[in-house]
């Protein structure tokens, strides 16, 4: 498993920086965003360092599939209202032009009454 010693998310996963953990297993880690945009707002990341979605390969299909199945379960556990009246939003920014600020692949999972409309 690869880690970048300069990556803030790798440091959080390793326990060197405190976080409010939501979930962890051998492949995935989830923790609350420190500047939430919604009543429910956590990050879902691979434990190993992948800079962005642009670096994914066929080897990543299994954990990526697990991540997509896990996200709705965690969203509900964290307080998102059930689909279809409720729901949640997943955002994954890729690269500088895509708005990615931390160079460790991650998804923002957000829920609540349209919090992203705040601007």
Q: Model-predicted segments: where are they?
A:
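HIT superfamily nucleotide-processing domains
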Residues: 1-119
């Amino acid at each position: 498993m690869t880690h970048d010693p300069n990556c803030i998310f790798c440091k959080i996963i390793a326990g060197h920086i405190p976080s409010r953990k939501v979930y962890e297993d051998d492949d995935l880690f989830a923790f609350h965003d420190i500047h939430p945009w919604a009543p429910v707002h956590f990050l879902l990341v691979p434990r190993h360092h992948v800079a962005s979605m642009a670096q994914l390969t066929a080897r990543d299909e299994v954990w990526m599939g697990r991540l997509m199945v896990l996200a709705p379960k965690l969203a509900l556990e964290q307080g998102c209202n059930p689909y279809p009246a409720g729901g949640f939003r997943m955002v994954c920014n890729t690269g500088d032009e895509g708005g990615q600020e931390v160079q460790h692949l991650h998804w923002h999972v957000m829920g609540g009454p349209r919090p992203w409309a705040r601007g």
